[in-house]
Regions:
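Active-site-proximal helices and loops of the catalytic beta/alpha 8
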Residues: 103-104, 108-111, 131, 193-200, ...
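Conserved residues at the C-terminal ends of beta-strands
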Residues: 48, 88, 209, 214, ...
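Substrate-binding/active-site clefts of carbohydrate-active enzymes
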Residues: 1-201, 221-229, 234-239, 245-246, ...
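Active-site rim elements
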Residues: 17-23, 181-182, 207-212, 308-316
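Active-site neighborhood of divalent metal-dependent phosphoester/pyrophosphate hydrolases
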Residues: 120, 303-310
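Active-site glycine-centered loops adjacent to acidic/histidine catalytic or metal-binding residues
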Residues: 117, 337-339
Length: 341
């Protein structure tokens, strides 16, 4: 059928062929290769979100065709289109391996911690569908009850008197995603409850997606509530900006004391190790004594990840990049595959 989730090739002019469906990756696959990761000296694994996503490919889009700017024809294989944040997506668990089993075996058999990818800003694509599709724009609770439904409506058409619309903002956010209202206390309660139960199943740290799309006050409340249950829990976030002054605010205690992925560092490393600029560029992002970050040594450092092109360096450039990554300040994060250059 048109909306099957497996093996959906996508061809966009000017881009390499891609596939937007599920291709079989699951928790068992990660566990089967965990020792390979541990043998390289890594101590933790971060995957994209594990929560339940819609079962079909999205049929709507404000954008023409299937270009990089639109989600038409794509599935939630990546995990960022959550509809039930209390449930594991059915593509990930397998017979004899629940998520709790997975984190326990990572820890006990391979010495690896698991980092959970946290999304509070949005749910799944929620509007522009020719006909409303199951699960899209919906949220379910721990009992499987429907608590929010966008109804395939433009955000501006949502009804203030409809309790199923109360979770959503009235202005569009990212693409056609259901944009969640951080000013609604029920949204905070939903996510605190959801992510607390994943801590009970062996999660060791949080990586927070799209942190800049929600107010600092929300993240302060969220982090306080979560750390009341797990004191000292390490959290780091994605604020996709190359301006240190922008991303540093998240690390301050009054904003939740959440570390960040070091995008300014990524920019400097690509400039030096891929483009061949002066090594002096590397000093600009460290901020060891500027006081900009609450603790610069807790920043997550990287030279590429799943949201961007891989670093295009030659062999010596990759060797130098990894030498720098693993010996300079911060906590190194390596995107799978980059370990071989």
């Amino acid at each position: 059928p048109e909306t099957r989730t497996f093996d959906r090739p996508m061809q966009v002019e000017g881009y390499a062929p891609a596939n937007v469906g599920y291709l079989g990756g699951d928790l068992k696959g990660v566990l089967d290769n965990a020792q390979y990761i541990a043998d390289m000296g890594f101590t933790a694994i971060w995957t994209t979100p594990i929560v339940d996503n819609p079962d079909e490919a999205f049929t709507g889009s404000r954008y023409p065709g299937r270009g990089p700017g639109g989600d038409k024809g794509k599935t939630g294989y990546h995990g960022y289109w959550g509809v039930n944040f209390f449930e594991v997506d059915e593509h990930l668990e397998s017979e004899g391996l629940t998520f709790a089993d997975f984190t326990r075996r990572l820890r006990d058999e391979h010495g690896l911690k698991y980092v959970l990818d946290v999304v509070c800003n949005h749910g799944s694509p929620a509007w522009t569908m020719p006909e409303d599709q199951p699960m899209f724009g919906e949220l379910y609770d721990a009992d499987g009850a429907l608590v929010a439904d966008h109804g395939n409506l433009h955000p501006g058409a949502l009804d203030d008197d409809n309790p199923l619309h109360a979770y959503f903002n009235r202005e569009p956010g990212l693409a056609e995603l259901a944009d969640l209202n951080e000013d609604n206390p029920d949204v905070l309660e939903y996510f605190v409850a959801a992510y607390s139960q994943w801590l009970e199943q062996g999660v060791a740290a949080f990586r927070i997606d799209t942190i800049a799309f929600m107010q600092h006050a929300y993240w302060k409340r969220f982090s306080d509530r979560i750390r009341a249950q797990r004191p000292g829990l390490f959290m780091f976030a994605e604020h996709f900006s190359y301006e240190a002054t922008a991303i540093a605010e998240h690390t301050w205690p009054e904003n939740g004391a959440i570390s960040v992925l070091d995008f300014p560092g990524r920019e400097a490393m690509n400039s030096v190790f891929a483009d061949g600029t002066s090594y002096s560029e590397l000093e600009s992002y460290l901020h060891l004594e500027s006081g900009l970050y609450q603790n610069p040594y807790e920043l997550m450092t990287f030279y590429d990840n799943h949201d961007m092109d891989r670093m295009d360096a030659d062999t010596n450039g990759f060797i130098d990049a990894n030498n720098w990554l693993f010996t300079s300040r911060g906590i190194p994060v390596v995107y799978y595959g980059s370990e071989i250059g």
